[in-house]
């Protein structure tokens, strides 16, 4: 629950603590996604999903991601559900296919990213109303 600060302010504090302090060569910037500074309240992070190469391209990523969205909606009723997506995947439209409805280039701003962090991520997110709309769409399409 981020009632006292925004997602962007939280990143400025926590990303530095988690990634820069143990990796002194890393340098966190302060030009994070603009929308992150307006996100407050109950916020759920949707992490990475990795599929074996032979399981890709069959709609499984979309189905599993949407299932995660719906479970989070039912369990936590978040104000926002967000993820960080590689720029090339965001520009290919992967986020819209799985259910994200809002996109902002440059999620977190790294001047020098730690080795295991992508420096080109986009903030992708949905509001609670977006998630409710996604649930209605899934139900309507499932009944056809």
Predicted regions and their residues:
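Conserved beta-strand in the GNAT
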Residues: 1
């Amino acid at each position: 629950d981020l009632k006292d600060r925004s997602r962007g302010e939280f990143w400025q504090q926590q990303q530095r603590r988690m990634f820069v302090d143990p990796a002194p060569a890393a340098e966190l910037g302060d030009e994070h996604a603009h929308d992150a500074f307006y996100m407050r309240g109950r916020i759920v992070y949707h992490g990475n999903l990795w599929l074996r190469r032979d399981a890709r391209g069959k709609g499984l990523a979309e189905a599993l991601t949407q299932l995660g969205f719906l479970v989070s909606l039912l369990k936590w009723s978040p104000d926002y559900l967000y993820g960080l997506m590689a720029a090339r995947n965001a520009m290919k439209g992967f986020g819209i296919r799985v259910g994200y409805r809002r996109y902002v280039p440059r999620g977190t701003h790294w001047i020098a990213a730690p080795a295991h962090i992508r420096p080109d991520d986009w903030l992708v997110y949905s509001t609670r109303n977006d998630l409710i709309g996604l649930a209605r769409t899934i139900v309507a399409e499932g009944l056809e």
